[in-house]
């Protein structure tokens, strides 16, 4: 564990620091990062010694409870913070609360604004989900030389803006391996293959709990959480049905679930009610 001061000047211990992350990159030591949306997920991630957690800034405090010493990046969701003032305030609030870095998918000017305040900032390049329509839908980008060079240009602009790292999403693996040689950014690879410095996946994909969307091609499940969820929800459904059936039949509530008045008090109540 490393002793550090947070952005809010609180002395804490962390499993890894930005300095360590950069050193690991330079030494070609792979790192891991997983999303967490709540305390329970964070506890599991921390227990298994994952290097870094990324979460939404609104969920940060709950996630931190589950992983008090893990390096946590707080993502500033684009729709949550609109103006520069809102972005800056949101970033300050979560960094003061103890986040180790912030990630923003916004402009290079926004990255620069945050970095100038002394925050550790990460950008987002590649197939940024909100930009999927620009690429003709959800797909891997960087499959042509021109696209790969555009991604590298974005990385260089992030460097110039003061970012230390970037989430690189759905970029062709061989393209990233080559363009990575030309950037100092710490590369968090989400669906971009082995060229990243940090291998990054979503908690629900890893645990087999993806629902409502098609499982991403780059994702892999090492568990079957959905099977357990189905069993749990079947048990819940049976319990709800049992409650309804027992109410309708008069079996609930019974004497096991109720309390009567003290001896003689019911008679006293009836007498009082007669005179009410």
What do the predicted segments below correspond to?
Residues 1-276:
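Alpha/beta enzyme core
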């Amino acid at each position: 564990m490393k002793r550090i001061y947070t952005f809010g000047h609180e002395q804490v211990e962390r499993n890894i620091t930005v300095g360590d992350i950069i050193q690991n990159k330079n030494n070609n030591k792979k790192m891991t990062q997983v999303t967490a949306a709540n305390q329970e997920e964070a506890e599991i991630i921390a227990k298994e010694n994952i290097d870094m957690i990324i979460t939404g800034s609104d969920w940060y405090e709950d996630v931190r409870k589950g992983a008090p010493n893990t390096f946590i990046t707080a993502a500033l969701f684009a729709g949550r913070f609109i103006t520069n003032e809102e972005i800056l305030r949101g970033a300050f609030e979560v960094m003061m609360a103890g986040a180790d870095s912030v990630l923003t998918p916004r402009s290079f000017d926004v990255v620069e604004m945050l970095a100038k305040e002394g925050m550790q900032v990460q950008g987002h390049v590649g197939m940024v989900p909100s930009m999927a329509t620009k690429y003709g839908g959800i797909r891997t980008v960087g499959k042509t030389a021109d696209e790969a060079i555009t991604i590298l240009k974005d990385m260089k602009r992030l460097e110039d803006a003061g970012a230390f790292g970037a989430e690189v999403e759905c970029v062709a693996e061989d393209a990233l391996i080559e363009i990575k040689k030309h950037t100092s950014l710490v590369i968090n690879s989400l669906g971009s293959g082995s060229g990243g410095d940090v291998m990054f996946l979503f908690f629900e994909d890893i645990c087999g709990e993806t629902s409502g969307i098609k499982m991403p091609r780059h994702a892999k499940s090492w568990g079957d959480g959905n099977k357990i969820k189905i069993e749990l929800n079947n048990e819940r459904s049976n319990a709800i049905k049992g409650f309804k059936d027992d109410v309708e039949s008069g079996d609930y509530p019974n004497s096991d679930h109720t309390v009567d008045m003290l001896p003689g008090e019911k008679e006293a109540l009836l007498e009082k009610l007669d005179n009410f």
